[in-house]
A protein has these predicted regions:
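Conserved RecA-like P-loop NTPase helicase motor core
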Residues: 686-697, 748-856
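A contiguous, basic/glycine-rich beta-loop/short-helix subdomain that forms a polymer-engagement track
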Residues: 429-454, 465-472, 562-689, 697-704, ...
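Conserved helicase motor "Helicase C" RecA-like lobe of SF1/SF2 P-loop NTPases
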Residues: 722-747
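A substrate-engagement module of RecA-like helicase motors
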Residues: 177, 230-281, 349-454, 462, ...
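Metal-dependent nuclease catalytic cores that hydrolyze phosphodiester bonds in DNA/RNA
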Residues: 1-75, 100
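Conserved catalytic cores of phosphodiester-cleaving nucleases, focusing on short active-site segments
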Residues: 37, 65-91, 105
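Conserved pre-motif I regulatory segment
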Residues: 164-207, 220
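Signature of the SF2 helicase/ATPase Hel1-core->accessory helical subdomain module
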Residues: 218, 224, 245, 436-453, ...
Length: 873
């Protein structure tokens, strides 16, 4: 059997040693790297060859990749690397890795072109100065062959182990049983269309209400698609920590179902084939190798029927009609071609896999069966760096942090132990890391290369420098992306592709910066002040980012890189943070287009004095503000084989298709939920206006409506207002006019303990009204079943405030889509309303009431955005 791996992946495995060292930072962004490569190759002569596809093999290891360039006139192969800072300060182990890659490419080129010798060059391109530094070696073809073979031999055992894992994983996932006795209402349709998306290689928007089991209903078919040869990896992306916990619980449930079936006591009556297989078998030869080192002749056999279930035929699920069914012929998965960047699997030295722990997820899973074979599925939880770092006061290099010292020398043992455990949540990764004295955060990043399901925040795939996106590109993974609570992605993506630069922070950085940074900071401040002098209004929108300001920021970043490489501890954290802010700002300014606006906000007088400006001297805040993240997200969707965005609130579908950059032909599924209109009484208080101008007059009728409802049916209620001020005034009036009503309210800046205390008052048999701001922490993502919550009062349409910034965003949306008001105000506002109202009915047994308090709820354009199953009175 032959195992295929990319040049880069193999060299990162075989040639990395020594310390983890992040002093050579801030590194160029991926966009800067692409631009840098283009500049270097554009300077070469006409005969210069670019992006040369190369392949070769030794023993059972097949290697593929693309060399950056070859100059036939000089007989020189070039490996191009972008950097910023002082090249002489680059860590030796970084340089060794670069040479390893270049020499492997050199051998592959010699073999392909029958060359007797070759000059191999590392071309380092400074993204700030645009200078090239070229290092060369001249080798005979024989010496390059010897180098190549030595790397392959070091990699072979690891690759063979990964092949065995992949074969076992796919075999298990092909017959993975559904973990419940039957599908919930709507869950079958959701699972079927998710599977079709993976099978056909397309995106899907799925609106699915609370109560149908969305997490299991999306993970299960994606895993079956892996087993059937359509996918290599599954990414489960969430907006908040509770979403990660639900995904990990669902994966534990699926593990338990597998173990129960393996032991002859299936966890559920619905079979795997019934739940996720397609009427069309995957084509023979479907690649099961793209994630690294699998046999080149591996194919994806048809999933066998599950004898434990009546519904054993593949057609049992996917022949059901749904709004998301594809009318065209299904796209076949990639066949035959192995990944040019495919990483290999766990070391053959790995300990025997342990049984996965018991877990609770959406329903109590069957306990792990003693002696049952555990599901050969590696699941990894990724968490933020600040939540993983063991030494937050240390710099990330071996001279400062003990967990960075010798990181790559101890990585192999940590990796082998971790991959044998298979379930790699935050606590497990930390335990393994500390046992081997390596950094937990960077161990998790290494484990992402070898994991089958990765659970993490949106930013791990959608951010501009996202880890999972980079790995997917490098390794050419066929990934299935599940985006949980996808209505949150719009605001989160806007944040990812927006950057703020604050002149007050610059002033603080100047006070604390080392002398080596004084000149570039002063130059940046002068250019900034020049911009301030031209500004007449307090808020200004400009067509472009001033080039002089941008150049000054770039030079400051370059100088920071040099100082970081030389003396990283000489830069205080606040100065370093400003440097990273500047780098993010410059990166987005260089990509500025109609998807964003550039605005300048002047701060002066008392506001400036409060921020430390002597005499209230005016300063400003610059912002590259993303409005339409579609332009940045579309390439990420295109890279994935399947992207499924699901949520309880994705209405109207075209709004999310447009703003999130999904293809026009993306099907939309509106899942019928388990709830009946009789469970929820929805009334409109059309005699009240909550508009700003009517705010004072609205207080008394809102309070009387609340008091009347509470007297009619005492219990636990939530009241939602548009602002903390509005909320406070309502609560004060209730306490004044109806002191017998128990009330409590959300405060600004509540910590986790305070939020928990707020929610703790919603208990079975309890009584009272908790007031919160619409769109805040208590308006979504909380689960208060039964009598814990019996009603909600929503005294707002949730429309964003009309101000200069939002009006500029509205204009940008109008220019692109022609529906500026709806896209900026109405649709986002009503999404918050529906999310908040969704707190009331959580199960098929709940009953409750929702009062929509504003005359605008009578309007047709507003009511069409409410859930179909509601009956509005």
């Amino acid at each position: 059997m032959s195992y295929t791996v990319a040049v880069r992946a193999m060299c990162e495995f075989t040639a990395k040693s020594g310390d983890l060292d992040l002093r050579f930072t801030p590194a160029p962004s991926s966009q800067e790297g692409i631009i840098g490569h283009g500049i270097v190759t554009s300077r070469r002569d006409d005969g210069y060859e670019r992006e040369i596809a190369l392949a070769g093999e030794h023993g059972e290891v097949a290697v593929r990749g693309r060399a950056d360039g070859y100059d036939p006139a000089l007989n020189r192969l070039e490996e191009i690397k972008t950097y910023r800072g002082d090249l002489n300060r680059m860590p030796a182990n970084h340089r060794a890795l670069h040479w390893a890659q270049a020499r492997v490419y050199g051998h592959l080129l010699c073999k392909m072109r029958d060359l007797a010798n070759l000059t191999v060059a590392l071309v380092y391109f400074d993204v700030d100065s645009h200078r090239e530094s070229v290092l060369t070696e001249t080798h005979s073809a024989d010496s390059l062959r010897d180098w190549f073979e030595s790397q392959c031999e070091r990699f072979a055992a690891f690759a063979a182990s990964e092949a065995a894992h992949r074969e076992a994983r796919d075999a298990a996932l092909r017959v993975l049983p559904f973990p419940h006795g039957s599908f919930r209402s709507g869950q079958r349709a959701l699972a079927a269309d998710v599977y079709r998306a993976a099978r056909d290689g397309r995106a899907l928007l799925a609106q699915a209400p609370t109560g149908i089991g969305k997490t299991v209903g999306t993970l299960f078919p994606m895993l079956r698609a892996c087993g059937d040869g359509y996918l290599d990896r599954v990414l489960f992306l969430t907006a908040k920590t509770p979403g990660r916990a639900l995904a990990l619980d669902a994966l534990a449930l699926l593990r338990a179902a597998h173990e129960g079936a393996a032991a002859g006591s299936p966890a559920g009556g619905a079979s795997a084939s019934a739940a996720a297989s397609t009427a069309e078998s995957p084509p023979g030869g479907a690649s099961s190798e793209a994630a690294g080192g699998l046999p080149s002749d591996a194919s994806s056999p048809e999933a066998p029927a599950d004898p434990s279930s009546e519904a054993s035929s593949p057609e049992a699920l996917t022949d059901l009609p749904s709004e998301a069914s594809s009318s065209g012929a299904p796209a076949a998965p990639s066949s035959g071609a192995s990944s040019p960047e495919a990483p290999a699997g766990p070391s053959s030295e790995a300990a025997q896999p342990e049984s996965s722990p018991n877990a609770q997820a959406e329903a109590a899973p069957s306990p792990a069966v003693p002696g049952a074979a555990p599901l050969p599925l590696r699941t990894l939880e990724l968490v933020a760096r600040e939540k993983s770092c063991e030494y937050p006061d240390r710099a990330c290099h071996g001279e400062s942090c003990p967990l960075a010292r010798g990181f790559y020398d101890r990585l192999g043992g940590a990796r082998a132990q971790a991959l044998a455990l298979r379930t790699l949540d935050r606590a497990t990764v930390r335990e393994v890391a500390l046992a081997h004295q390596v950094c937990p955060y960077y161990l998790a990043q290494e484990l992402a290369r070898w994991s089958d399901v990765i659970v993490g925040d949106y930013n791990y795939y959608y951010d501009g420098s996202a880890l999972l996106h980079s790995l997917a590109v490098q390794n050419q993974w066929r990934i299935g992306v599940l985006v949980d609570e996808a209505h949150n992605l719009l605001d989160r993506a806007r944040g990812m592709y927006s950057a703020t630069l604050d002149q007050f922070v610059l002033a603080d950085a100047k006070r604390h910066a080392p002398p080596t940074l004084a000149a570039p900071l002063e130059k940046l401040n002068r250019e900034w002040n020049a911009l301030n002098r031209e500004q007449e209004a307090a808020y200004l929108v400009m067509d472009t980012v001033p080039s002089a300001l941008l150049l000054a920021a770039q030079r400051f970043i370059g100088r920071v890189s040099e100082v970081m490489a030389d003396a990283p501890l000489s830069i205080e954290p606040n100065v370093l943070q400003f440097a990273f802010d500047a780098m993010h700002f410059v990166n987005l300014a260089e990509q500025f287009d109609t998807h964003s606006i550039f605005d300048v906000t002047r701060v002066e007088g008392e506001a400036a004095r409060r921020r430390g400006s002597r005499g209230g001297r005016a300063k400003s805040v610059l912002c590259v503000r993303n409005v339409i993240p579609a332009d940045f997200l579309a390439p990420r969707h295109a890279l994935a084989r399947a992207t499924v965005l699901f949520s309880g609130t994705l209405t109207p579908f075209h709004f999310y298709l447009d703003t999130l950059g999904l293809p026009e032909a993306t099907p939309a599924l509106d899942v019928e939920g388990p709830f009946r209109a009789a469970q929820l009484k929805v009334t409109v208080a059309g005699h009240v206006s909550t508009r700003w101008r009517d705010r004072e007059r609205s207080l008394a009728p809102i309070v009387e409506l609340i008091a009347r409802q509470y007297a009619e049916r005492p219990g636990n209620y939530l009241g939602f207002l548009s602002s903390f001020d509005y909320l406070r005034r309502i609560v004060e009036l209730i306490r004044e006019t109806h002191p017998e009503l128990p009330v409590w309210m959300q405060e600004r800046g509540m910590d986790e303990a305070a939020r928990d205390a707020f929610l703790a008052r919603f208990r079975e048999g309890g009584q009272g009204i908790g007031f919160a701001v619409l769109g805040g922490a208590f308006a979504e993502g909380i689960d208060l079943v039964g009598d814990k919550l019996i009603g909600a009062f929503i005294a707002t349409l949730g429309l964003p405030q009309v101000n200069e910034v939002n009006e500029q965003m509205r204009r940008a949306l109008e220019a692109r889509f022609g529906s500026g008001y709806d896209y900026m105000y109405l649709f986002p506002g009503m999404q918050k309303v529906v999310q908040a109202a969704g707190r009331v009915i959580r199960t098929e047994h709940d009953e409750g009431v929702v009062h929509l308090i504003d005359d605008r709820y009578r309007r047709r354009e507003v009511q069409r955005l409410l859930p179909r199953w509601w009956r509005v009175e």
